[in-house]
Amino acid sequence: MATATEQWVLVEMVQALYEAPAYHLILEGILILWIIRLLFSKTYKLQERSDLTVKEKEELIEEWQPEPLVPPVPKDHPALNYNIVSGPPSHKIVVNGKECINFASFNFLGLLDNPRVKAAALASLKKYGVGTCGPRGFYGTFDVHLDLEDRLAKFMKTEEAIIYSYGFATIASAIPAYSKRGDIVFVDRAACFAIQKGLQASRSDIKLFKHNDMADLERLLKEQEIEDQKNPRKARVTRRFIVVEGLYMNTGTICPLPELVKLKYKYKARIFLEESLSFGVLGEHGRGVTEHYGINIDDIDLISANMENALASIGGFCCGRSFVIDHQRLSGQGYCFSASLPPLLAAAAIEALNIMEENPGIFAVLKEKCRQIHKALQGISGLKVVGESLSPAFHLQLEESTGSREQDVRLLQEIVDQCMDRSIALTQARYLEKEEKCLPPPSIRVVVTVEQTAEELERAASTIKEVAQAVLL
């Protein structure tokens, strides 16, 4: 039956071919030949290319104007007008040959130039040498690294800790180690740049909530809960993370951790807490925002911090439950593929921890000095203080913007320069403006340390007031 049908179709096709008009057949034949030519012919013929004469080549070379490798940089760009520091940036700092009181470095506990810390680093230098020349998995693990991890875990009262050789890479590596494509991350709009890079590397679905606005965060969590109900199968394999800072670098404010913990359990999310500014600052013993609020540290899934602020060393660490930390030893990019922390810096961090444990009163001293300068800086005409009174790093922003970010930056830099002329070292907060997710307003960043005396704090506040009045009014 099928054979008869096929024969009938073939007969019909032949009959249609005979009955077709001649012009129709000619047109189809031309099209078929043209298609064959296009398939088998080259896109160009070598003989059709005419060689240029030497004179023509020279003219083309002279006319050619290459595009610049980098965009033009204005002469007043900060990268071209940097300050040169001589000696350690501790309590007093020598900038461009001028000695100033340091209100710019994150040396909160004054350990950067501490004799005990330097002695520990020197002893380690004599024992181990300068560096390790290898990552932790390839002969880069020294006993001092394990000692530091053990000390950090005990200090933070967690099961385990892991150290990284670069502070920025700590949270930027930890986030993509857990959060992957398809997962959902709820993050504060004021999150620091290291968190932003970690989120970018994770390729997760990012949802921004207003700074420290728990109502806005819950709104996003509820919306996600509704979406999960529409597709339960996908929801079962989608992980949800909340990423916040204990003390925000860009605002100087403390996160509302108790409310975050409630939302965590209510909506079944995990909390990543970045404590680079709050570690060694908040809490009775400097354990950070969990101790500040009296929160059980087991309620936080992962805590990270760098050791470049309070500990006055280099690198960073993560701490938490053992199974959480062990995962990073194979998945943390900054841990697996970077040379391990130089032993001398690990030894310095251990000695800094010893000092913190031996002198818990140092944290109360720091808080009191923070309150003093916050109070002294209130009421500056043209400037407003941004940050909480407990924060040793806060911002001075213009009360009213000029409408131009460039002009705002110039005004604030003029204040910084005139303060330096009066031996008060400040700095503007700098950002990669084109890469920031939510670019903060221009500001002067002020840093308080335990080494600054009450008289120096008052002097700095009065100097800033006088200079601001002269520049802004």
UniProtKB/Swiss-Prot annotation:
The species this protein was found in: Macaca fascicularis (Crab-eating macaque)
Domain text: The transmembrane domain is involved in the interaction with ORMDL3.
Modulation of this protein's activity: SPT complex catalytic activity is negatively regulated by ORMDL proteins, including ORMDL3, in the presence of ceramides. This mechanism allows to maintain ceramide levels at sufficient concentrations for the production of complex sphingolipids, but which prevents the accumulation of ceramides to levels that trigger apoptosis.
SUPFAM superfamilies for the chain: PLP-dependent transferases (SSF53383)
Keyword Lipid metabolism: yes
Cofactor: pyridoxal 5'-phosphate
Stretches that traverse the bilayer: 16-36
Stated name of the protein: Serine palmitoyltransferase 1
Annotated GO biological process: ceramide biosynthetic process; regulation of fat cell apoptotic process; sphingolipid metabolic process; sphingosine biosynthetic process
Compartmental location: Endoplasmic reticulum membrane
Gene Ontology MF term list: pyridoxal phosphate binding; serine C-palmitoyltransferase activity
Binding partners and assembly: Component of the serine palmitoyltransferase (SPT) complex, which is also composed of SPTLC2 or SPTLC3 and SPTSSA or SPTSSB. The heterodimer with SPTLC2 or SPTLC3 forms the catalytic core of the enzyme, while SPTSSA or SPTSSB subunits determine substrate specificity. SPT also interacts with ORMDL proteins, especially ORMDL3, which negatively regulate SPT activity in the presence of ceramides. Forms dimers of heterodimers with SPTLC2. Interacts with RTN4.
Lumenal side: 1-15
Encoding gene, per UniProt annotation: SPTLC1
Phosphotyrosine PTM sites in chain numbering: 164
This protein's GO CC annotations: endoplasmic reticulum membrane; serine palmitoyltransferase complex
Membrane topology term: Single-pass membrane protein
